[in-house]
């Protein structure tokens, strides 16, 4: 078990660094990778708690960039619908959720690599729709950051503004779904001991990501990240049929 958690912590740190740099959030990489070493619903529970600390770190590091209007218009529907998505995990079979997660993540990554997401228009309607979809999928499959990222990209925010605005929205989403996951038994008493490690990882990963962001072209790194996501989700999807 300790060996599993050691790998889990390494994956969490890697995903946190990558998530900060790419602006997609760490869950799109972390959830499918962590599901290889731990039960999927346990990953959902731990990820939600981990992300609370992760987003607090990002909000502190990038706090000057928060766009309050976008955060409210995208964040309110996300917070409302994440609860609905999280409750669905009690009724949909786990294997089907995992398969659906990997299919959706693979499709989003492929869509973003194609460049078509740049055609999304800057509008309140897209903010409300993006918030609804990102929140629902964050609750159901553990990640909605890519959809939120696609929506935010239409507004041409600066790096700091993009990350800070995304983080404060994600904060509300994670607090909401964490409550549902804990009530559903996904995060149990035995996992409380992980919290100090998750706090350290979230701070270290966010800080490292911010420093690296100054040296690596964001666009180049995003394509690398998307490639890793494609490969990871494809491998996980194939494992479903083994």
Regions found by a protein language model. Give the residues of each.
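Interfacial loop-to-transmembrane junctions
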Residues: 207-229
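Membrane-embedded helical hairpins/re-entrant loop segments and their flanking transmembrane helices
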Residues: 105-163
């Amino acid at each position: 078990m300790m060996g599993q958690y050691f790998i889990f912590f390494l994956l969490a740190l890697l995903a946190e660094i990558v998530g900060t740099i790419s602006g997609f959030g760490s869950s799109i990489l972390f959830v499918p990778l962590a599901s290889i070493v731990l039960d999927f619903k346990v990953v959902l529970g731990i990820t939600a708690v981990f992300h609370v600390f992760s987003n607090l770190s990002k909000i502190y590091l990038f706090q000057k960039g928060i766009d309050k209007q976008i955060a409210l218009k995208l964040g309110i529907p996300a917070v409302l619908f994440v609860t609905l998505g999280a409750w669905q995990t009690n009724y949909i079979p786990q294997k089907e959720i995992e398969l659906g997660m990997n299919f959706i993540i693979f499709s989003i990554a492929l869509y973003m690599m194609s460049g078509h997401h740049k055609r999304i228009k800057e509008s309140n309607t897209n903010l409300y729709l993006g918030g609804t979809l990102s929140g629902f999928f964050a609750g159901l499959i553990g990640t909605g950051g890519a959809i939120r990222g696609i929506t935010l990209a239409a507004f041409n925010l600066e790096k700091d503004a993009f990350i800070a605005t995304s983080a404060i929205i994600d904060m509300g989403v994670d607090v909401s779904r964490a409550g549902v996951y804990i009530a559903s038994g996904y995060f149990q008493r035995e996992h409380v001991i992980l919290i100090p490690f998750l706090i350290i990882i979230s701070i270290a990963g966010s800080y490292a990501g911010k420093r690296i962001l100054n040296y690596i072209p964001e666009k180049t790194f995003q394509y690398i990240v998307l490639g890793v996501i494609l490969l990871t989700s494809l491998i996980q999807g194939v494992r479903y049929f083994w």
